[in-house]
């Protein structure tokens, strides 16, 4: 997994791959991937944009993934959040293609919701599952590979809540 914490570190990752595989091979073949997180709502910071440009120029894959907490950073409805996820992913994909047409890109999504009483994030909820499934359907229709998050929970103990949330969030990720 390539570094995305600063564009120069992304370039270091590409350069290390060039040492391992050969520079020409790396330019012709995808040998690594990176995870570009979008700061929802609809914010691409300079660090992520710079790293995305480095990987696109080098023909290396980038997972373009919004980090969305429904009800806090996105609409509370499934349809509203799904719309935002797709808009953010397509913005990242488009930028990557402007940098290098044909650059490999993977659509991603990290979606959860918020407890409107406490403000705490919730995991393994039906809403997050619907958004994750919906995103997968939409990006597959667009011909993009898809990656989603899973196997996380908000429980403080290894208890029934942890098991339920982990299982449900893992299931939607599969």
Residue locations for each model-derived region?
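Helix-rich catalytic cores of soluble enzyme domains
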Residues: 1-174
